């Protein structure tokens, strides 16, 4: 009797453990908060009680969270998050801009590598552009960008209906432009922001030659360099490449 009870108890504990593990895995997969928590920690962001900074912080985080996420739309949860993680924001301009930039750049580059020659690739690109458009719509800046995209004569409702499938570069260029405008909106006086803007230009140039991104070793290195912080005074990737080509010709 005792042995059977122990077996039942072991089974019950295992069952509960498996259920809880599945719940945890589901939560981890459905949220990107952990990734952004690491990014904020790296940037050593500290937020004080200035309401304007708080609003900018929430807008920036909402911009990066999944479209279905309503974490920061509830004031109580927002306050609890700030208290629990002791996140304080001294200066939103350089740090948050860098985080948002790096996140969207990774998303944009992943879009550029989707093969649109088959049906699955087209469907994937359509879903991803729709998802990213929802992210852009999460902030005041995003709403402005969204309306501008919808009213564009080259393709109204490009993101809303996933019609960017036939012209993926057109959609990707919009996102590169949106990142640049986000950085300008956050303040162009910061050296970090200027450096980030230079990297956006390098990304936009690289995306213009998709074959080079996929085939050229030099282009792959350029993509990696995009994520390395650089001083504004240093030459950009594009200028390095042009000077190298000139020296080769001579």
Curated annotation (Swiss-Prot):
GO cellular component assignments: chloroplast
Sequence segments annotated as region (Disordered): 207-250
Predominant cellular place of this UniProt entry's protein: plastid
Biased composition (Low complexity): 233-250
Entry keyword annotation includes Plastid: yes
Localisation: Plastid, Chloroplast
Protein name: Uncharacterized 28.3 kDa protein in rrn23-psbC intergenic region
UniProt keyword annotations, A-Z: Chloroplast, Plastid
Basic and acidic residues composition bias: residue spans: 207-226
């Amino acid at each position: 009797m005792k042995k059977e009870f122990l077996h039942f108890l072991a089974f019950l504990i295992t069952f509960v453990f498996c259920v809880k593990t599945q719940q945890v895995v589901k939560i981890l997969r459905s949220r990107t908060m952990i990734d952004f928590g690491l990014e904020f920690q790296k940037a050593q962001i500290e937020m004080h009680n200035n309401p304007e900074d708080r609003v900018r912080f929430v807008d920036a985080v909402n911009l990066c969270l999944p479209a279905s996420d309503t974490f920061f739309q509830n004031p109580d949860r927002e306050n609890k998050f700030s208290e629990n993680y002791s996140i304080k924001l001294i200066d939103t301009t350089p740090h948050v801009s860098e985080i948002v930039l790096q996140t969207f750049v990774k998303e944009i580059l992943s879009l550029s590598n989707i093969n649109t020659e088959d049906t699955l690739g087209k469907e994937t690109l359509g879903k991803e552009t729709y998802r990213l458009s929802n992210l852009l719509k999460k902030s005041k800046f995003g709403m402005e960008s969204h309306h501008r995209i919808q009213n564009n004569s080259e393709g109204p409702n490009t993101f809303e209906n996933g019609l960017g499938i036939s012209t993926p570069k057109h959609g990707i260029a919009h996102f590169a432009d949106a990142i640049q405008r986000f950085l300008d909106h956050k303040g162009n006086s910061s050296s970090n922001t200027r450096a980030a803007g230079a990297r956006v230009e390098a990304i936009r140039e690289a995306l213009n030659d998709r074959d080079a991104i996929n085939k050229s070793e030099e282009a792959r290195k350029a993509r990696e360099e995009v994520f390395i912080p650089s001083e504004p005074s240093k030459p950009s990737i594009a200028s390095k490449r042009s000077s190298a080509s000139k020296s080769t010709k001579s």
